[in-house]
Regions:
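Glycine-rich beta-strand-centered segment in the early N-terminal region that forms part
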Residues: 1-9, 14-52
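NAD(P)H dinucleotide-binding glycine-rich loop of Rossmann-like/cofactor-binding domains
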Residues: 29-34, 43-109
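Short, glycine/polar-rich helix-capping loops at beta-to-alpha or helix-loop-helix junctions
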Residues: 53-54, 133-144, 205-212
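Mid-domain Rossmann-like dinucleotide-binding core that forms the NAD(H)/NADP(H) cofactor-binding site
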Residues: 78-157
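N-terminal Rossmann-fold cofactor-binding loop
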Residues: 132-136, 170, 226
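N-terminal Rossmann-like NAD(P) cofactor-binding module of classical short-chain dehydrogenase/reductase
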Residues: 165-168, 194
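Glycine-rich phosphate-binding loop and adjacent beta-alpha segment
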Residues: 174-248, 282-283
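C-terminal hydrophobic helical "lid"/dimerization subdomain
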Residues: 231-283
Length: 283
């Protein structure tokens, strides 16, 4: 019914993602999608990497399916799931103790995933949400933030930000180092740094730049969040709640549905770059 084409799918198609490093042709780079059971008419979310989904039909193990509400829009769910799940899974499965009552910083808050993260963190009970980005105008338009900080070299946080508990980083690169060095940490608590994305893919990784003494000077926990970070049990537990959440929230970006038959034409198009591409069955 619908398959999203987020950045990770594009990276897999180009063999620039770890999950596709050993791929051989023919290769289907899809991650997940929405399917229709032709025998019952029921809609299902298909769990990540359960089957190749750039196809008219797919044979899926029932354990990899999450039933959706009959009124769910397949295109909407397919467009949102990757962007929303990145912060949902990070805050529910990676952040120790979750984000309830805590301060969450989103580095790269103007990205599609960053915008979704603000909505997710609020729904999961974060007490304060701070967004960081280089662009003042687009940062001002991000909904759900309590405070906004412009990313400027040397990438330091103002003292007015106060103590932080969780830092979700969608950018990576040198900015994270300056932010961790200048971040305040509440006594008795850890600052949990979770790298979720790598928008600064051309820059050196923060672990290459991080002064080793910093993790001795501050109680900092450094971790990643991605497909290899979660167990099958994590996914089965979280997906029903995530799907229910996705069907109710406001979409924070434009969606571009296109027929599967036009995949070559739309893959690198301007619409696919500015909007969130979702492939649907050809008529």
């Amino acid at each position: 019914m619908a398959v999203g084409v987020p950045r990770v799918v594009q990276a897999r198609a180009a063999c620039k993602h770890p999950s596709a490093s050993n791929a051989s042709l023919p290769f289907d780079p899809s991650i997940d999608g929405i399917g229709l059971d032709e025998s019952t008419g029921e809609l299902y979310y298909i769990n990540p990497l359960s089957a190749p989904l750039f196809a008219e039909r797919a044979n899926i193990n029932q354990s990899q399916l999450v039933r959706l509400d009959p009124e769910a829009d397949p295109v909407r769910v397919a467009a949102l799931v990757n962007f929303v799940s990145s912060s949902w899974m990070a805050l529910k499965c990676r952040a120790i103790g979750g984000c309830q009552g805590r301060t969450v910083v989103i580095v790269g808050a103007t990205s599609a995933s960053g915008r979704a993260a603000a909505i997710v963190a609020r729904s999961l009970g974060a007490a304060r949400i701070i967004g960081l980005s280089r662009n003042e105008d687009t940062l001002a338009a991000v909904e759900g933030l309590d405070d906004r900080v412009l990313l400027r070299e040397p990438f330091t946080l103002p003292e007015s930000v106060g103590p932080l508990h969780i830092m979700l980083d969608y950018v990576g690169g040198p900015a994270a180092v300056g932010l961790l060095q200048s971040a305040q940490v509440e006594p008795g608590e850890n600052l949990q740094y979770i790298q979720v994305g790598g928008l600064a893919s051309d820059a050196a990784h923060m672990l290459q730049l991080l002064p080793t003494h910093l993790i001795n000077l501050k109680p900092i926990c450094i971790m990643g969040s991605g497909m290899g970070s979660f167990t099958k049990q994590d996914l089965r537990r979280e997906m029903p709640g995530l799907m229910s959440f996705i069907t109710k929230i406001k979409v924070p970006f434009e969606i571009y549905p296109a027929p599967m038959a036009d995949v070559q034409a739309v893959w690198g198009s301007e619409n696919a770059t500015k909007k969130r591409l979702v492939l649907v069955p050809s008529l």
